[in-house]
């Protein structure tokens, strides 16, 4: 994930040109994973949520704990990252304090991930120590089927609360409820994306509500089931431009295999 300032500049450029060159022709680096319209929540309400951080404790991406030592996130969060410089904070409502911070012993991302199309945007991290479940730390299950369009889900994270002009991240975990849009519907004329939506993706939409920069890699969940991974989108909470997520059911086999072999 690019640094927040760099990402904001890229997103601003993307927004400025989207109207003239068309959504499908925009540079993929201008549409990184993007909580707008959300509200403060607690880690106890979403105990699977984790924060990926650098050595200084700066949050750069979200993730989901799926077992005692495995975190699922987006591939683009891990590209170029050195294991020794990545840490995971678990069990805290605040990204900058509380809970526990665990080092990472290994990480990988899908070999078929494309930074151009954002297909197969999934990766995992293996923690350096096993983490037991508590009231504030829980493993989340992987969905086996994509929920029908219109199903309500929740996306959480510490990402920017607005698009472009918010220069700091909220310290308190944010949550927003959105409605699932299957990939075929998301690629249809009903929305503005068209051919840039693929079968390893799922969308989620609610007017003036969305994930935003800093939320990348975080969970789109229904109950205790992970259905999506925050991946990308044009701007944040834009009209007829849903947030785009990696579809967990479509990528479940890869996640399980990587978790067992890494």
From Swiss-Prot:
Location of the Peptidase S1 domain: 35-260
Signal peptide extent: 1-19
Disulfide bonds: 61-77, 186-203, 212-236
Enzyme class: hydrolase
Reaction(s) this enzyme catalyzes, per UniProt: Preferential cleavage: Arg-|-Xaa, Lys-|-Xaa
Family: Belongs to the peptidase S1 family.
Protein known as: Trypsin theta
């Amino acid at each position: 994930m690019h640094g927040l300032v760099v990402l904001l500049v890229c997103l601003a450029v993307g927004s400025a040109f989207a109207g003239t060159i068309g959504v499908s022709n925009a540079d993929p680096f201008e549409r990184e994973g993007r909580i707008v319209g959300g509200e403060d929540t607690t880690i106890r309400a979403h105990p699977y949520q984790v924060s990926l951080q650098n050595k200084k404790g700066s949050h750069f991406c979200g993730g989901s704990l799926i077992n005692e030592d495995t975190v699922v996130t987006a591939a683009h969060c891990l590209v170029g990252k050195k294991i020794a410089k990545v840490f995971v904070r678990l069990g805290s409502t605040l990204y900058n304090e509380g809970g526990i911070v665990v080092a990472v012993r290994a990480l990988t991302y899908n070999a078929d991930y494309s930074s151009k199309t954002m297909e197969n945007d999934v990766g995992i991290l293996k923690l350096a120590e096993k983490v037991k479940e508590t009231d504030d730390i829980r493993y989340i299950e992987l969905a086996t089927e994509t929920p029908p369009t219109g199903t309500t889900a929740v996306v959480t994270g510490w990402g920017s609360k607005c698009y472009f002009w918010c220069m700091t991240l909220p310290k308190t975990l944010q949550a927003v409820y959105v409605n699932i849009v299957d990939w075929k519907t998301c690629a249809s004329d009903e929305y503005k994306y068209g051919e840039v939506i693929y079968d390893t993706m799922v969308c989620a939409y609610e007017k003036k509500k969305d994930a935003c920069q800093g939320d990348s890699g975080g969970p789109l969940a229904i109950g205790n089931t992970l259905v999506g991974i925050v991946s990308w989108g044009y701007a944040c909470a834009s009209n007829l431009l849903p947030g785009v997520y990696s579809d967990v059911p479509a990528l479940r086999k890869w996640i399980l295999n990587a978790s067992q072999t890494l």
